[in-house]
Design a protein with these regions (language model features):
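A generic structural signal for beta-strand entry/edge sites
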Residues: 34, 77-79, 102-104, 130-134
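Hydrophobic-ligand binding "helix-grip"
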Residues: 72, 86-130, 140-142
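Hydrophobic pocket/interface hotspot
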Residues: 50-53, 60, 80, 95, ...
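Soluble non-cytosolic domains of exported or imported proteins
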Residues: 41-48, 54, 115, 149-160
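Bacterial N-terminal signal peptides that target proteins for export
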Residues: 2-19
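A conserved amphipathic terminal alpha-helix motif
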Residues: 134, 140-172
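Hydrophobic ligand-binding cavity/cleft-lining segments
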Residues: 27-74
Length: 172
């Protein structure tokens, strides 16, 4: 009996993969892809000044306009519950990392009304120049199928509103 050659094995594997892909596509199922978003703003303040304002986990209620209240559990890991000013939306977020030295924290959504899953975000402050800092808000998430644009627009609006408020608080 003749051993299959590498070419034959590769050809057979390629055919199986192609058939599998065709079967997957014929089911009208689309693969899930993670999306990323990052926004930043330069602020006329020192790193320490900016971090003291935005660093506490529940300080978000002071710089994110839609947030009416923030309640922090204080456990480990810390959780916060955000309720919008109109009371119509609630977000529960878990802090997953925090670095006072790195002037950053990361969090995930435990529950959210936004059309996303697997949301993970980081807010950090970095020095830019003398008396100027940059606030960076970034995330990865999986948008709900058919809601990709809605998810991106909602998150972009949230990030831009928050960053604009941070900048305004330090504008002289």
């Amino acid at each position: 009996m003749k051993k299959p050659t590498t070419k034959r094995i590769f050809t057979g594997a390629t055919q199986i993969a192609a058939l599998g892909a065709l079967a997957f596509l014929s089911l009208n199922v689309s693969p899930v892809f993670a999306a990323t978003l990052s926004r930043s703003v330069d602020v006329s303040a020192t790193l320490a000044q900016v971090w003291s304002m935005i660093g506490p986990f529940c300080a978000i209620q002071d710089w994110l306009p839609p947030v009416g209240t923030c309640r922090e559990t204080g456990g480990s890991p810390s959780e916060r519950t955000l309720v919008t000013k109109d009371g119509k939306a609630t977000f529960v977020e878990t802090q997953t990392a925090r670095s006072e030295a790195g002037h950053s924290y990361s969090y995930t959504f435990k529950s959210s009304p936004l059309p996303v899953t697997a949301y993970a975000s980081t807010i950090k402050v970095v020095p830019k120049s003398d008396g100027v800092s940059t606030v960076i808000w970034s995330s990865t998430y999986v948008p709900d199928l058919g809601k990709e644009q809605d998810a991106r627009e909602a998150l972009t609006g949230i990030y831009e509103a928050g960053l604009a408020t941070i900048k305004a608080k330090f504008t002289k």
